[in-house]
């Protein structure tokens, strides 16, 4: 049966217009976002006989507490709003694309005054260019090693670059011809940027055109009897030709396309992409998709394209002219219009029927099938172990349900100074690092016990405060035709309660945490402590600990939680200690206020590097004169003695 709190809207309440809808749970978190050409037809289908619904759709409807929707003018607007909401709320019942590994990219930091070429993983930054993804980081380094001879661009970090500027000498790459050394003025910033832009042109698919230009310049230099330059251009052309030959030619020259294939079963699907530029495979990427509802291949392709190209932000170069898919998406025309607007030129979605493109699509499909098989083999053991661990913890602690969300707290201190605490979160037995939190504790007495009481009080006081705000609507000022934004819709730091709280320690720490929860009137959160020495599990109001077998999966999971909380607390404590030590050294110097302290640290990065600097280098910091630099130099070297 449907959850009793979810009211079925009357048919007349739901418009027949295109729009986007949201399901919310009892904690006012968005759990599913969808779009529809006809909202009435789509939403009514969720309230059919539960036995006819896909099992995961049934689970979603059962978990839902309320439903709302927004009308939009066009299907393209619906597609864009659906993507934005999925990105904003991260609903747990929407399809989640998880990379089967963290693929590296070759990043070009065009947003910086002196751009840098680097291996990069993580969220893309506006203004930079990204090439790839590559299967391995060494593949990027091999490519760079070949191309830096032709395009001697900067690859060093900001610290190395500033050091070269200070000492007036480039690094080794400058001396062997693999960097043009803008740090010491061998080329100007404008000349270096042109080198980088030429590199981007070659990586973007214009390698053959650039090679022809090199060969033309080489012949012209030879004709002018400038044999030294001709020899250098010949070597550059050979290096570029070698880099091109390392990439497999799969389609005719000037073909820019993304080739996408899927392999799926009832529960999951693997998606694989080959990125083809200038007829060559420039990179590939794979995802594993959890099928939350009954979706056919056309629907999967639709969802995947929306998320893949929505993810790239405003980088029009990431959207190719042609996208090859095994089955046409469920709304090809809308997708093509949306992608064309993102690219700034026409984009075609095609299903190849014969020839090289069909053969390449079959190759990508084989990769997807292999990825799905490997994923299931790996996950079979992992899922079994995690499920067993959660069941063992449930049984050992006598919990009503398996603890799907566990929070663990640890305190770090050094002789009572810089007391900090950490909160780490595991969901379904896996770390949820976006939910980790750090606490700075000031004026807390009682050692670890007092610190545990303080951090638990702060965490759950915030939880109660944010839960109180969930009924407070916020008008985002976009007008009556735009969706109202609820306060609870936005990600809050502490708005979701855990199934189980673990504290690092024994009976005293557990008692302190229990006292904090009691003071706040919270009685529906399970609590336990894990003592380090004998790995005993302490429960509130029990004189004897619970002992799990040494080889049990449940104990292993609790140890991972405790160790992760300890690592996170220690790293925060070290950072705070380093900051306070730096501040204490500079605070004792006459004439150095907060502004100048920040200027010194921005320029040098650390007190150690300041100690290595000369008076002239200290005086080069903005806002610092010669006299102040001499005072700082004397104070720093006096501190050494």
UniProtKB/Swiss-Prot annotation:
Coiled coil: none annotated. The keyword GTP-binding does not apply. It is found in: Cytoplasm. GO terms for molecular function: DNA binding; excinuclease ABC activity. One of its GO terms (biological process) is nucleotide-excision repair. It holds the Pfam family GIY-YIG. SUPFAM superfamilies: C-terminal UvrC-binding domain of UvrB (SSF46600), GIY-YIG endonuclease (SSF82771), RuvA domain 2-like (SSF47781). Keywords: Cytoplasm, DNA damage, DNA excision, DNA repair, Excision nuclease, SOS response. Its main location: cytoplasm. GO terms for cellular component: cytoplasm; excinuclease repair complex. InterPro entries: GIY-YIG_endonuc (IPR000305), GIY-YIG_endonuc_sf (IPR035901), GIY-YIG_UvrC_Cho (IPR047296), Hlx-hairpin-Hlx_DNA-bd_motif (IPR003583), RuvA_2-like (IPR010994), UVR_dom (IPR001943), UVR_dom_sf (IPR036876), UvrABC_protein_C (IPR050066). Residues 208-243 form the UVR domain. The UvrABC repair system catalyzes the recognition and processing of DNA lesions. UvrC both incises the 5' and 3' sides of the lesion. The N-terminal half is responsible for the 3' incision and the C-terminal half is responsible for the 5' incision. Belongs to the UvrC family. This is UvrABC system protein C. The gene is uvrC.
């Amino acid at each position: 049966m449907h959850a009793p709190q979810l009211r079925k809207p009357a048919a007349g309440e739901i418009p027949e217009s295109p729009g986007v809808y949201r399901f919310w749970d009892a904690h006012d978190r968005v759990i599913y976002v969808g779009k529809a050409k006809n909202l009435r037809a789509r939403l009514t289908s969720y309230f059919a006989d539960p036995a006819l619904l896909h099992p995961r759709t049934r689970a979603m409807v059962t978990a839902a507490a309320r439903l709302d929707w927004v009308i939009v003018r066009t299907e393209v607007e619906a597609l864009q709003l659906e993507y934005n909401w999925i990105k904003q709320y991260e609903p747990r019942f929407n399809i989640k694309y998880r990379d089967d590994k963290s693929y590296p990219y070759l990043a070009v930091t065009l947003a910086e005054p002196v751009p840098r070429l680097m291996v990069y993983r993580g969220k893309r930054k506006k203004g930079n260019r990204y090439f790839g993804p590559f299967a391995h980081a060494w593949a990027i380094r091999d490519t760079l090693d070949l191309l830096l001879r032709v395009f001697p661009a900067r690859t060093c970090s900001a610290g190395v670059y500033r050091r070269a500027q200070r000492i007036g000498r480039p690094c080794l790459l400058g001396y062997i011809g693999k960097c043009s050394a803008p740090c010491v003025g061998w080329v100007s910033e404008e000349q270096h940027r042109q080198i980088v832009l030429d590199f981007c042109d070659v990586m973007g698919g214009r390698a053959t055109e650039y090679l022809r230009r090199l060969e033309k310049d080489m012949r012209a230099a030879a004709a002018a009897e400038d044999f030294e330059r001709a020899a250098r251009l010949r070597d550059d052309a050979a290096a570029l030709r070698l880099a091109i030959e390392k990439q497999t030619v799969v389609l005719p020259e000037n073909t820019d396309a993304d080739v996408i294939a899927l392999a799926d079963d009832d529960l999951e699907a693997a998606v694989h992409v080959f990125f083809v530029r200038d007829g060559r495979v420039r990179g590939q990427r794979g995802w594993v998709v959890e099928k939350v509802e009954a979706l056919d291949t056309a629907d999967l392709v639709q969802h995947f394209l929306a998320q893949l190209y929505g993810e790239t932000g405003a980088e029009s170069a990431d959207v190719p002219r042609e996208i090859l898919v095994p089955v046409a998406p469920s709304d090809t025309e809308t997708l093509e219009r949306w992608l064309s607007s993102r690219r700034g030129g026409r984009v075609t979605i095609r299903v190849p029927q014969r020839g090289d493109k069909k053969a390449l699509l079959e190759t990508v499909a084989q990769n997807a099938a292999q990825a799905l098989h490997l994923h299931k083999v790996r996950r079979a053991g992992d899922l079994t172990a995690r499920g067993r661990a959660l069941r063992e913890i449930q049984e050992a602690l006598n919990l009503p349900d398996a603890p799907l969300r566990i929070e663990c707290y640890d305190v770090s201190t050094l002789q009572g100074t810089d007391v900090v605490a950490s909160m780490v979160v595991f969901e379904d037995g896996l770390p949820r690092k976006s939910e980790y939190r750090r606490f700075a504790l000031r004026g807390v007495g009682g050692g670890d016990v007092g610190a545990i009481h303080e951090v638990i009080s702060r965490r759950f006081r915030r939880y109660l405060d944010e839960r109180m705000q969930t009924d407070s609507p916020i008008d985002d000022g976009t007008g009556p035709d735009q969706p109202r934004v609820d306060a609870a819709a936005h990600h809050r730091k502490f708005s979701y309660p855990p199934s189980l709280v673990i504290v690092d320690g024994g009976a005293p720490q557990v008692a302190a945490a229990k006292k904090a929860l009691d003071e706040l009137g919270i009685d529906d959160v399970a609590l336990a402590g894990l003592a380090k020495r004998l790995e005993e599990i302490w429960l509130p109001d029990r004189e004897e600990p619970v002992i799990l077998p040494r080889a049990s999966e449940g104990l292993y999971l609790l140890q991972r939680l405790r160790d992760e909380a300890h690592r996170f607390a220690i790293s925060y404590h070290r950072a705070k200690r380093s900051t306070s030590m730096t501040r204490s050294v500079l605070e004792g110097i006459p004439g150095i206020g907060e502004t100048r302290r920040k200027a010194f640290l921005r320029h040098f990065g650390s007190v150690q590097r300041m100690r290595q600097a000369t008076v002239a280098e200290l005086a080069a910091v903005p806002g610092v004169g010669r006299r102040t630099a001499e005072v700082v130099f004397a104070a720093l070297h006096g501190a050494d003695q």
